[in-house]
Amino acid sequence: MVAGPNGSGKTTLMRRLADDYAVNFYDVLNADDIYAEVRRTGAYAPRMSLLDGILRSYAETTSYPEEVKSFFRDGSITLESDLIRFAPDAVNSYTVALVASFLQSMHILQKSSFSQESVFSHVSKVDALREARNNGFRTYLYFVATESAVINAARVENRTALGGHSVPPEKIASRFPLSVANAAAALPHLSRAYFFDNSSETMRFFAEWDEENGLMSSDEANGGFPKWFAPIADAAKKIPVSGGRFDVQPNPALSAPAAVASHDAIARAFAAGLQVTVMRGGKIVRVSPDGTETEVKGDLS
């Protein structure tokens, strides 16, 4: 699971981990990518073999509203010959989310490895990790966030200007604490977790969770944990483990792709003439391509 609030840098981090660190993410279930493919082609091709008709049966078991399930019931969304087809009026974020949930369940049922990219603001994502763990999977979480939803909102604004999807600032702000809380709640269901802070110009890998050793980091003793990490650190200390140490240094092999990921994003923004929003000296600032700095006042609360 690659997770974190909207605009934290999940997609860029995931790409760099795969390219530079050779992380195998297997079949990546990303609702945004599924939505884009369905909008473009009217269909989505799962990377697994599935029985015709099983999607409709699955939809009926979910808690989605009837108006969403009706698209599966009336044949507007069908699974035939390993292709999920959507009628034009059936394409929306809710139907796509249900399909992503279905594919997740099928992977767990078939015991085939997969990954998800998620804002992690809904408890169902914690439930998915619990279910996978209970079915014999090793579960990994890569979680990235920033010190302020203001930074995230500004980066989503840049993403939108570059052709990506938008998210309202108030939704980013409301989801932010939920994402962090769910990361804390997920710890007992994880084999391992890696935590990244993307507040400044350089994304930083600063802590690791291991089911045997607990929270491993050199940053706590140095006062270096980002503020957003406090609920996760508190939860980690309450979970009994066999070891536990704070003398390890951040893994250079993970630190390098994280740094490159953030630098890539900044380079894309500057190339398009956009400002970037980062933490500098404890302040949130907007930096122009020419290096001009402007402090950002206020918050999204």
Residue ranges and their predicted role:
Residues P5-N6:
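The conserved Walker
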Residues T11:
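Walker A/P-loop
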Residues M14-R15:
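The feature captures the helix immediately C-terminal to the Walker
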Residues A18-L109:
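Conserved substrate/cofactor phosphate-moiety recognition/catalytic segment
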Residues N134-N182:
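A glycine- and Lys/Arg-enriched "phosphate-lid" helix/loop adjacent to the NTP-binding pocket
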Residues L187-P240:
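NTP-dependent small-molecule kinase module
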Residues L254-E293:
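Amphipathic, hydrophobic secondary-structure cores in small proteins
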